[in-house]
């Protein structure tokens, strides 16, 4: 084997090693940025308050934030601070009406939200999304509902 062949083999080995290292770094960065990104770094792309009757028919649907008018809020505050909101004075006068709050966090390349959290005042919590974030919900459903609503309204007031 000549010196030229040894150098060529060494160059090929180094090139393959370098390519593998770059691929591994890209995978790790993608994993951290896309999958392990903390919830508090996501932006709220939309949030709306929905009131439905006992049959599930929509009574009132009011946007807290429109997609064209994004509001940035420290999401960690939503889950870490306690607002003792026991009732939300709104919606319809129907005694069987159920208030529901949906918040969409983040945004994927196709424009869909990363994750949606829907909290009803009866305590029902639904989490949907393309990625599963490690959420720790510290509150009962109705307290979390009022708490999220208060934080969103507080954020809207601060934006104006």
Residue positions per predicted region:
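Function-determining sites in protein domains
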Residues: 2-160
């Amino acid at each position: 084997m000549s010196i030229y062949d040894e150098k060529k083999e060494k160059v090929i080995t180094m090139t393959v090693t370098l390519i593998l290292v770059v691929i591994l770094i890209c995978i790790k960065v993608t994993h951290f940025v896309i999958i392990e990104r903390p919830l508090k770094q996501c932006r709220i792309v939309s949030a709306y308050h929905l009131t439905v009757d006992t049959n599930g028919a929509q009574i009132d649907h009011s946007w807290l934030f429109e997609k064209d008018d994004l509001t940035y809020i420290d999401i960690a505050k939503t889950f870490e601070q306690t607002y003792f909101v026991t009732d939300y004075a709104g919606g319809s006068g129907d005694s069987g009406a159920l208030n529901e709050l949906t918040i969409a966090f983040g945004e994927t390349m196709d424009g869909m939200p990363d994750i949606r959290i829907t909290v009803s005042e009866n305590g029902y919590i639904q989490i949907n999304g393309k990625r599963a974030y490690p959420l720790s919900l510290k509150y009962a459903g109705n307290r979390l509902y009022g708490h999220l609503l208060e934080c969103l309204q507080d954020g809207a007031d601060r934006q104006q």
